[in-house]
Design a protein with these regions (language model features):
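Terminal substrate-recognition subdomain of acyl/acetyltransferases
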Residues: 371, 375-437, 547-609
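Substrate-recognition element of Asp-dependent hydrolases with the DxDx(T/V) motif
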Residues: 287-318, 332, 370, 466-471, ...
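Asp-based phosphoryl-transfer active-site loop
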Residues: 249-265
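Conserved Lys-Pro-Asp/Glu-containing loop-to-beta segment of HAD-superfamily phosphomonoesterases
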Residues: 343-364, 370
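Active-site neighborhood of HAD-like aspartate-dependent phosphohydrolases
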Residues: 260-287
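Acyl-donor binding region in acyl/amide transferases
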Residues: 502-585
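Alpha-helical cap/lid subdomain in secreted, periplasmic
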Residues: 2-9, 35-44, 61, 69-70, ...
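A conserved beta-strand-loop-helix scaffold within acyl/acetyltransferase catalytic domains
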Residues: 442, 446-529
Length: 609
């Protein structure tokens, strides 16, 4: 086993690009080492695998990659080829299991009907529709019965082409049939937020169709794909799952010299660095800059951490034939400080964890320093410039499972925060500064319009999150519909821009602990995006929560704080809001109470609704 940095959250053996043969061979010792890591608080999730082939190895590989991302899976595994029956008719075991997520592992081997050359065009359309509806019925039954996330494989290309090259264009070809069926699957995914595709059409092509589907493995053991390909499939699947549960990275810290351009700008001069279309090396760096720039449009925060004079760094970014410009970066740290220090300072400035970064640098020594000093940061071994994009893309640090309006304008939101910080520096009275922001909040019960964003926040927010409870969209929808619950989302707008939905609170009347003389309301979850810290948004949310609780006849509100490695900043949140601590256990979990009678509103700087 290769040496590991004991401080790191991630095990290098399971980072992309991994040695699949090694992972298969050492799966037991790798799992043991993952579970022995100190300080990792796992997110527990129940995952049902409904398979059209033997799935034992897929389950074992998926477990490793999920553990490496801080997710501890508990599995239900269907009997061989019982995926459809389990999904449509259910089983007592699956019902009792109550999955958070169902993964349906089907492949070309599981098609019930295939086209042949004797069929007419209309007959082929009919069997295509029948095959699609067979799957659609399964997805709808899962939604009806479990209301959970579904991940479904699309289809790989067949390992032979009966019609040769015409197999893809002729309606009788299986390749053509599968392409049309895959498109139907994709269209379903576009209109169902809890449904996601595991793109084995792409993964199998990347792996190599001839090697992906081994007839010997299929006929002897009913493996599809072959055993050797299961780590690749499981890694791709784990990318989706970790993204769904808030484990994506949020920012890129880029080196400059020999990373975003060829050469050293301080030595060669900005006019001589390699970028643009003049030669092959320049084109390589231009494409990589374009790849990094595209992440900005996805809401990924771009920053610079470079050992350089700032003047030289900015001159390099000013090259007219470069893709990335100064304004594409939220923060530029071009100086002679250590890069780990610069990344930590950048993280503090924009108010995210340093472990939310991917550090991109061509220099192995710089990578090692950053990796060994910042827990949880991702540091890919980029290789040569020709492989930069392949390594970054294959790792799936920023796997997209849905794009919200907030995602698309995230960079603008963080830039506005920097403008706010600049404005704050000109005030001596902080309350006057807050008033100058002209803040307006929309604080209302959960709305279908924002349900996806609310769910996303419950699975991503870690620092300002008092209980770190994670929720599926089905759960958030059920809370909104339950008259025993109070649910609130908060949007915040000020003169610098719209912050979007930034806070979520929900809880329920605790009938069990209530008495005829004292109705108790428990806050199940309270979270807020760190980009609106110290803006009194929490006060506005508290005021509205207490108002609604009083309408329900609540006499006492109870709040809970469960400490994690990341939420220490809110340890005294309830104390600062006038709550009284009533208990604390040996793990630091605390319970707080507030009498609603006599509560006075705390927000004085935000106009609400």
């Amino acid at each position: 086993m290769r040496a590991r940095n004991k401080r790191m959250e991630y095990m290098k053996e399971l980072d992309f690009p991994f040695d699949a043969e090694y992972v298969l061979r050492k799966k037991k010792s790798l799992k043991r080492a993952l579970l022995e890591r100190e300080g990792v608080k796992y997110l527990n999730k129940k995952i049902a695998i409904l398979g059209g082939s033997t799935t034992e190895n897929i389950k074992l590989m998926l477990e490793l990659f999920l553990l490496n991302n801080g997710i501890a899976p508990e599995f239900y595994e269907s009997e061989y080829n019982r995926y459809w029956e389990d999904a449509v008719f259910g089983t007592p075991e699956l019902d009792e299991f109550k999955p958070d997520l169902i993964y349906i592992h089907t492949t070309v081997r599981n098609l019930k009907i295939r086209p042949d050359v004797t069929m007419s065009s209309s007959q082929i359309d009919e069997i295509l529709d029948a095959e699609y509806k067979r799957f659609e019925a399964m997805w709808e039954k899962i939604e009806e019965r479990y209301g959970c996330i579904v991940i479904q494989n699309n289809f790989e290309q067949p390992y032979y082409r009966l019609l040769g090259n015409s197999d893809i264009s002729d309606i009788h070809g299986l390749s053509n049939f599968l392409s049309r069926l895959n498109l139907k699957f994709a269209e379903y995914a576009q209109t169902h937020e809890k449904f996601h595709l595991n793109d084995i059409h792409y993964i199998s092509a990347e792996y190599g169709i001839k090697n992906w589907s081994d007839p010997a493995d299929w006929y002897r053991y009913k493996y599809n794909p072959c055993v050797a390909a299961t780590p690749d499939l499981a890694y791709n699947l784990a990318r989706i799952i970790k993204a769904l549960y808030g484990k994506n990275k949020k920012a890129i810290a880029c080196d400059l010299d020999n990373t975003l351009w060829g050469g050293v700008v301080g030595d060669d001069g900005p006019e001589n660095i390699k970028i643009g279309r003049e030669d092959a090396v320049s084109e390589l760096y231009e494409e990589f800059q374009g790849y990094i720039r595209a992440h900005r449009d996805l809401g990924i925060l771009l920053t610079v951490a470079s050992k350089n004079d700032e003047e030289n760094a900015l001159a390099g970014l000013a090259r007219p034939d470069g893709v990335l410009k100064k304004d594409d970066f939220l923060v530029i740290k071009a100086n002679w400080e250590n890069k780990n220090t610069n990344i930590a300072n950048t993280a503090a400035e924009i108010n995210i964890g340093a472990d939310a970064f991917v550090f991109v640098d061509d220099n192995p020594m710089e990578r090692n320093i950053v990796e060994s000093t910042i827990d949880g940061i991702a540091v890919p071994d980029l290789g040569d410039p020709e492989t930069y994009i392949r390594i970054m893309d294959g790792a799936g640090y920023f796997e997209v499972t849905g794009l919200s309006a907030d995602d698309l304008k995230r960079n603008e939101m963080y830039k506005a925060n920097i403008s706010r910080a600049t404005a704050a520096a000109s005030f001596t009275d902080y309350t006057e500064y807050l008033k100058s922001l002209e803040m307006k909040a929309e604080i209302l019960p959960f709305s279908p319009m924002y349900m996806a964003r609310i769910t996303e926040l419950t699975n991503k927010s870690n620092q300002f999150n008092l209980t770190t409870r994670r929720c599926t969209q089905a759960e958030t929808e059920s809370f909104a519909a339950d008259p025993n619950y109070i649910t609130l989302y908060g949007k915040l707008i000020d003169k610098f821009g719209d912050n979007g939905v930034v806070s979520v609170v929900f809880g329920h009347v605790n009938d069990e602990d209530s008495t005829p003389d004292c109705k108790i309301f428990d806050i199940d979850l309270w979270l807020m995006s760190c980009r609106v810290l110290k803006r009194d948004m929490e006060c506005a949310m508290m005021d509205e929560l207490v108002r609604l609780a009083k309408e329900k006849g609540v006499d006492k509100i109870r709040g809970f704080y469960y400490p994690t490695a990341k939420n220490k900043m809110v340890k005294e949140f309830y104390a600062d809001r006038g709550y009284t601590k009533v208990s604390e256990d040996e793990e630091g979990n605390t319970v707080w109470e507030l009498e609603t009678e006599g509560y006075e509103n705390r927000n004085s700087v935000i106009a609400v609704n």
